[in-house]
Design a protein with these regions (language model features):
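Conserved loop-to-helix N-cap of the C-terminal "lid" that shapes the substrate pocket in Rossmann-like
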Residues: 13-16, 170-176
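C-terminal glycine/acidic-rich active-site capping loop/insertion
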Residues: 43-53, 61, 65-66, 89-174, ...
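C-terminal capping/lid region of NAD(P)-dependent oxidoreductase domains
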Residues: 188-198
Length: 198
């Protein structure tokens, strides 16, 4: 199902909506314009399903302008599995830069390379200069509960808590809908080469 845009909404929806949601959460602002450049360069080129070639993109860039004046960018590469870190999330502002380096699931890390990477946080203040790097180890019990470096555990716990106690979920229906809307706008921009206003 996830080899075709018609079934998945496209890579920028299916794989990237979570990152668009994180952008909104971190910035506490709504997107107003999205621009993307993306394509299919490596993955699934020789596959056929029912005679049809997969058309999902495996790489791209997305720029999101927010109502607050903040700007965010997503870089996607679906064929860089050899990297030490699967995700690199950065925020830059007038006080400096903070980077979170997140490895992929440890079960995919080749044994011959030694222990799987540990998540890292790098805080680089503007003044005084001097990056501070620290490992952020994740409890192995949380890693066993699901992927995403333990966050699956917290997602399930918060969701179960909302059901059992009748509270609001941590992520609303509107949050999910906006993340998908951002992904669809990015897909449209990538297809047309034009910015999409939300």
């Amino acid at each position: 199902w996830n080899r075709f845009n018609a079934r998945s909404g496209g890579t920028l929806v299916e794989k990237c909506c979570h990152f668009f949601d994180l952008m909104r959460l971190a910035l506490q602002s709504e997107p107003v314009r999205i621009m993307a450049s993306a394509g299919q360069s490596v993955n699934h080129l020789d596959e056929r399903y029912g005679g049809a070639a997969p058309d999902i993109w495996d790489n791209g860039y997305v720029i999101v302008d927010f109502a607050s004046g903040a700007r965010a960018m997503l870089e996607l590469c679906m064929f860089a599995e050899g990297s030490r870190y699967q995700e690199e999330v950065c925020a830059t502002g007038p006080s400096g830069k903070i980077e979170a380096l997140v490895p992929g699931p440890g079960r995919f890390w080749p044994e011959h390379l030694g222990a799987a990477p540990v998540p890292r946080l790098i805080v680089s203040p503007r003044d005084p200069k001097g990056p501070v790097e620290m490992d952020i180890p994740v409890d192995p019990t949380l890693l066993e509960a699901g992927d995403h470096n333990g966050s699956t555990f917290y997602q399930h716990r918060l969701f179960a808590q909302a059901i059992r106690q009748g509270g609001a979920p941590a992520v609303s229906l509107n949050d999910g809908a906006m993340a998908v809307r951002m992904g669809l706008a990015a897909q449209q921009s990538g297809l047309t080469g034009q910015a999409v206003t939300l």
